[in-house]
Amino acid sequence: YCESHDQALVGDKTIIFRLIDADMYWHFKKGDENDMAHRGIALHKMIRLVTASTINGGYLNFMGNEFGHPEWIDFPREGNGWSYKYARRQWNLVDNKELCYCYLGDFDKAMIKTIKSEKNFNKTPVQEIWHNDGDQVLAYMRGDLLFVFNFSPTRSFTGYGFLVPTGAYSIVLDTDNKEFGGNGLNDDSMTHLTT
């Protein structure tokens, strides 16, 4: 999992809140061009995809992190005056198509579908293809799926190369797709051929 039980409970921050902080309260409406929120959404998707695609067992979503629930959970107890205020998940956030939570929820569904499309995915070893700390690029394969990540907040690459098995590659899941709140910088219809 990307987020532990303790992070989502009172006294700590959820992963999305660590990435975006209070900006998610004021800048999570679609079309709001806030760099902190935009970067946090991108990282949230990539962190979850790296985690889900490198595991050898089950992938655990914890109480709303699949759509970036902003607040912690605090069950009624003596220390909070037996309050129910934070003893809930706000599922209405992911259902609201005017807010960015739906991007994260839709991405989560597509990510799970992609991983399930690969037969015996969790039994297939992860094979590192490339990593470059300076470029902040990571690539690995799992079965027939090639995962390529650009973690740089400021650099996009055209014609970036690394060695992969001979063949033709097409994009089946793109964290930068506009459908998931990305910039849409990749041509998802393009077939990438090895040379």
Q: Where do the PLM segments sit?
A:
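Carbohydrate-interacting/catalytic domains
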Residues: M36-K45, V50-N61, N65-T195
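Aromatic-lined glycan-binding groove of carbohydrate-active enzymes
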Residues: Y1-G31
